[in-house]
Amino acid sequence: MPKLTPIRRKKFEKFLKFVGCTLKRTKGDHFIYDRPGLDRPVVITDDREVPVFIIRNNLRVLRISTDEFFQILREI
């Protein structure tokens, strides 16, 4: 399994859309995504890269393993 590293925000947004999330709103420099069946929204900031801790937290919210995450990234 590859190590999680920061990725570009645009790439992470493509990943979120691929797994069925839609942009609900923006507040300041935060983008809030949602998908039916989630307990809480997925939040990312308007930074150039998404840090590892935000990726890991959002994968936990989405109930997606890191292996599945890397497989999806290869597909998109």
Model-derived features with residue positions:
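Basic nucleic-acid-binding interfaces
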Residues: 1-29, 34-76
